[in-house]
């Protein structure tokens, strides 16, 4: 089975399935462990901060069950690679936190006839269901169109009650095992809604939509541009296109541990004269393009500015030029000095 996202939802799913003896678990992620992840992403610990989430997850799963085969897909799921990855598994678990990837996972599962075990969390609210079964509805039957991109933050932006991903992820693990073992009645055709604030569970019946663009009469024949569909340009234009932010604590740990990286401050000379992070190289944003050949494209790169805006812009520029991995310091020097 395949888990898309080694974060808050993917953690309990992968742990329970490894413990249950599932032979092969595929993991899709391209992020690193940040200290702010730890209150909800229990695959990872403090010693893993700065590591690849996939490597951290693999080691933790082998602690639980050394016999499980953990297949690592170190990339973001995109329209280009989704079908090639998903087709190798019997069940897909959606542990993502953005609409573009949710629609992508759904459509890939519909095209390949593979069940999609869905879960989502936001603040105190959670949802779970099973989509894309032979007779059941798919995600698009429930949500034909995505909400406006600027109205729906992800977990990092909007926040989530730390234990809620564990609750929803455990439900996803339960549904996955039931699918693999052909046991009981799954959540196919039902949406389970959880309000952790009042600790109420409700179940809503959902039906297959005959007019669904994915599984209905307007049957989907190929994957589309999901960033354009969801109004989130740049999120999945290629496997390295998303700018990853790190917080000051993570950067400090990398520096203290001597992790190989190049630290670039893209502020102007008048700004850097007031102080820089030790070891940083000062390259103003306006001259960055001319300096690209003097930088190591294969070395982890962290970009810094005053507040995080220019560094994010610089990170996108480096990603487009083939640098990987690239990170922007969240909050810039303002947050660095505050912390």
How should each PLM-predicted stretch be described?
Residues 308:
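Conserved G/P- and acidic residue-centered "switch" motifs that form tight phosphate/ATP-binding loops
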Residues 304, 327-328:
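Conserved active-site loop/cleft motifs that coordinate metal ions or position small ligands
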Residues 274-275:
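Cytochrome P450 core scaffold surrounding the K-helix E-X-X-R motif
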Residues 1-242, 262, 268-270, 279-290, ...:
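Adenine nucleotide-associated cytosolic modules
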Residues 241-257:
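A short, well-structured juxtamembrane/interface segment
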Residues 27, 328-329:
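A short, hydrophobic beta-strand element of the alpha/beta-hydrolase
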